[in-house]
């Protein structure tokens, strides 16, 4: 019965049958790894697994934004983007370049990780 529950009702059932290479984390990691010593910021949302996939350490204390009302976490992320201090930014917003024009979208992927479809965007700093 437990096995049937897992197969039918597990929240990660949307991932069944997908190859690892089809995940946005691994697709974006391929792009990020083309830059030696790349830096990355997971902007404005919970950690999406992109740091681990790319083999990159977070550049700051607030490497993601949680659901806690901590102004410092947002301020640190805004400061990093204002200073163009990271090579890449991964976000769930498709208009980051409107506020930070030094970054442009180089990849996007719509993905269902079990909580509904979302679109991840990878931005690169314009050189």
Short names for language-model regions:
Residues 1-20:
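Transmembrane alpha-helical segments
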Residues 2-4, 30, 125:
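Intrinsic disorder/low-complexity segments
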Residues 2-4, 26, 117:
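N-terminal functional modules and adjacent low-complexity/disordered segments of proteins
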Residues 14-70, 74-97:
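Short periplasmic/luminal acceptor-recognition loop of GT-C membrane glycosyltransferases, typified by
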Residues 87-127:
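Aromatic/acidic, Gly/Pro-rich catalytic loop(s) in extracytoplasmic/lumenal soluble domains
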């Amino acid at each position: 019965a437990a096995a049937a529950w897992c197969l039918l009702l597990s929240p990660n059932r949307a991932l069944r049958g997908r190859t690892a290479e089809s995940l946005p984390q691994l697709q974006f990691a391929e792009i990020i790894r083309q830059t030696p010593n790349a830096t990355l910021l997971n902007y404005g949302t919970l950690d999406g697994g992109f740091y681990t996939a790319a083999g990159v350490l977070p550049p700051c204390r607030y490497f993601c934004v949680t659901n806690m009302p901590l102004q410092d976490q947002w301020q640190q992320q805004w400061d990093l983007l204002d200073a163009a201090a990271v090579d890449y930014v991964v976000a769930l917003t498709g208009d980051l370049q409107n506020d930070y024009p030094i970054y442009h979208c180089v990849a996007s992927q719509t993905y269902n990780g079990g909580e509904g479809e979302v679109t991840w965007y990878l931005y690169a700093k314009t050189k």
